[in-house]
Curated annotation (Swiss-Prot):
GO cellular component: nucleus
Main location (coarse class): nucleus
Region (Disordered): 120-176
The protein's name in its UniProt record: Putative B3 domain-containing protein At5g46915
Species annotation: Arabidopsis thaliana (Mouse-ear cress)
Location in or out of the cell: Nucleus
Length: 288
C-alpha cells in the first residue's frame, strides 16, 4: 500500500544509511505504527531517533550499552539510554546533529574528553564575566541611591524581626497544646474493618485526646523485631502515611481481629514541621 506521509518516507530512506541522524520537527509518523520512537524535548522540538537495522548489527551485546526497543522495521533507543548519550557527549541546544558510531579508539575518546572539558571551562568563564559585569554596574550607583537602599533594608529587617517573634509565639502555643493533649496515655479498641486497610480513623472521643497537629508515631511490633513510622493527621483524626505498610508487614487482615492500641508520648516536638515523635503499641487478639 502506497503512503503519502513524507516523514515516513524519510525514515525508510534513513534506514539504509550506515550512520544515524534524524530530527523530525513537525512530522507525524504515528500513523505508520512508529509509536516506539523516543522523544527528546530539551531542544524545544519533538526529536525522534531511529537506528538502521544494518547499523545496529555492527554492535555486539557487550559493546552497545544503550537499551534498544526492537520494532519490525526500526530499532529505537530507549529514553534513558538516549539521554545518557546526550549527557556524555555534552550536546547542547545549538547542536543540530548527533552522530552515533561503534566504540572508537582511546585516542578519539581522549579528544572528546578534552572537547567537553573545554566547553565546561568556557561556560564557567562566561559566568564569571557576567558576575564581574553586574558588580561593576552596581558600583556606579549614586550616594542617594545607597542611602535609600540602606533605609529599605533597615525597615525590612525590623519587619522580619516582628514576624519572627509572632511566629515563635504561635510555635510555642502549638507545642504547649500538643504536649497537653498527649501527656497522658490514650487507649482504644476497634474491630479491624476493610476500611482500615488504607488508613485508621479513630473515634471522636479518642480524637479529643490526640495531638491536634501532624504527628509521627513509632509503632513497635509486639515481638520487638520491627517498627514502623506512621503519620497521624490531627485535622482528620486518622493514621495515614505509613499505615498501609504496617498493615502489610505486621500483618493485619480483615476479620475477627481486635486492635488494642496504647499511645504515649516519648519526647518533645522536633524542629521538622513541629512533628511530635510518639510511641504506639498495636496488639492483635484473634479469636481463631
Amino acid at each position: 500500500m502506497a503512503t503519502t506521509n513524507p516523514g515516513y518516507l524519510r525514515c525508510k530512506e534513513e534506514r539504509n544509511n550506515k550512520s544515524f541522524f534524524m530530527v523530525l520537527q513537525s512530522v507525524d509518523v504515528s500513523s505508520e505504527n512508529l509509536v516506539e520512537s523516543c522523544r527528546y524535548m530539551t531542544m524545544g522540538l519533538a526529536v525522534k531517533r531511529a537506528l538502521p537495522y544494518d547499523f545496529v548489527r555492527s554492535f555486539t551485546d557487550k559493546e552497545l550499552s544503550l537499551g534498544i526497543s526492537k520494532n519490525p522495521t526500526f530499532y529505537y533507543m530507549e529514553k534513558s539510554g538516549w539521554e545518557k548519550f546526550v549527557r556524555d557527549n555534552t550536546l547542547g541546544t545549538l547542536d543540530g546533529k548527533e552522530m552515533m558510531q561503534p566504540p572508537q579508539p582511546r585516542a578519539f575518546l581522549a579528544s572528546s574528553s578534552r572537547i567537553r572539558r573545554f566547553r565546561t571551562e568556557q561556560g564557567e568563564d562566561d559566568k564569571k564575566e557576567e558576575v564581574v559585569s553586574e558588580s561593576s554596574n552596581r558600583g556606579r550607583t549614586t550616594a542617594a541611591e545607597s542611602v535609600g537602599r540602606k533605609l529599605k533594608l533597615g525597615k525590612k529587617a525590623a519587619e522580619e524581626s516582628q514576624e519572627s517573634k509572632r511566629t515563635e509565639k504561635v510555635v510555642r502555643a502549638r507545642r504547649d497544646e500538643a504536649g497537653a493533649s498527649s501527656s497522658t496515655a490514650v487507649e482504644f479498641t476497634a474491630v479491624f474493618q476493610p476500611a482500615y486497610l488504607y488508613n485508621l480513623r479513630i473515634r471522636s472521643s479518642v480524637k479529643d485526646q490526640m495531638p491536634v497537629e501532624k504527628t509521627i508515631f513509632k509503632v513497635h511490633h509486639p515481638n520487638g523485631k520491627k517498627f514502623w513510622n506512621v503519620v497521624y493527621l490531627g485535622s482528620y483524626g486518622a493514621f495515614s502515611g505509613g499505615w498501609q505498610c504496617l498493615v502489610k508487614e505486621y500483618p493485619l487482615v480483615v476479620g475477627d481481629i481486635y486492635l488494642q492500641v496504647y499511645i504515649h508520648q516519648t519526647g518533645g516536638a522536633t524542629s521538622s514541621c513541629l512533628q511530635t515523635l510518639m510511641m504506639m503499641d498495636v496488639r492483635v487478639r484473634r479469636n481463631y
